[in-house]
Design a protein with these regions (language model features):
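Short, acidic Gly/Pro/Ser/Thr-rich loop/turn segments
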Residues: 1-2, 94
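Radical SAM enzyme [4Fe-4S]-AdoMet core and its adjacent flexible, acidic
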Residues: 18, 52-53, 57, 83-90, ...
């Protein structure tokens, strides 16, 4: 549903028969932690079945999502209140919407986070893939997550077979590093 600048999955969407099946999930060994990611996991119509099966195998499950499908996320969380949800917000509003290629994406993701907090969900937080375009938003976004009492997780821009993208690179490494330093200083206050 998104057109993220660091992931071309939308240009080459997988076919349903190429996605991991419930039968395959049943064969997985026991795990301590499982992260369900995408593309966008909430596009799957069998996500509840996947979560149900994974809870037989995993102590902790977190779903990484862009938070766009608020009603689906809330519905799943009502059935599985112990699940973790990490909503990818790639910066403040304009930056997030440009990187994610989703008009109103920031408001949808932020609104979903607020809704989950209002529901009493405990394991919720922000996720941010840091790159040149959004590094200046690191500290402001951290402050928002901190005010909401939520985890703030970061990853550095990288390439992956699953992204259908091999050209991701941080061009201004000193600027990005300085913004990470600013975040560390904020955390140490």
């Amino acid at each position: 549903n998104a057109r993220c600048s660091m992931c071309n999955r939308y240009k080459a969407p997988s076919k349903p028969e190429e996605e991991i099946s419930i039968e395959t999930i049943k064969k997985l060994p026991k795990m301590y932690f499982t992260n369900i990611t995408g593309g966008e996991p909430f596009i799957r119509t069998d996500l509840k079945d996947i979560v149900r099966e994974l809870y037989k195998k995993s102590d902790r499950i977190v779903i990484s999502t862009n938070g766009f499908f608020t009603d689906r996320i809330v519905d799943l969380c009502k059935e599985f209140p112990q699940i973790g949800i990490r909503i990818s917000i790639e910066g403040l509003e304009q930056t997030n919407n440009e990187i994610r290629g989703l008009q109103n994406g920031y408001q949808r993701g932020y609104g979903t986070l607020k809704k989950l907090r209002e529901m009493g969900m405990k394991d919720v937080g922000f996720g941010m893939t840091v790159q040149d375009k959004n590094a200046p938003d690191l500290v402001p976004l951290y402050k928002i997550s901190n005010e909401m009492g939520m985890e703030f997780a970061t990853a550095s821009l990288h390439n992956s077979f699953y992204f259908v993208e091999a050209k991701n690179i941080i061009h201004d490494r000193p600027m990005v590093a300085k913004n990470f330093e600013n975040l560390v200083n904020e955390l140490l206050r």
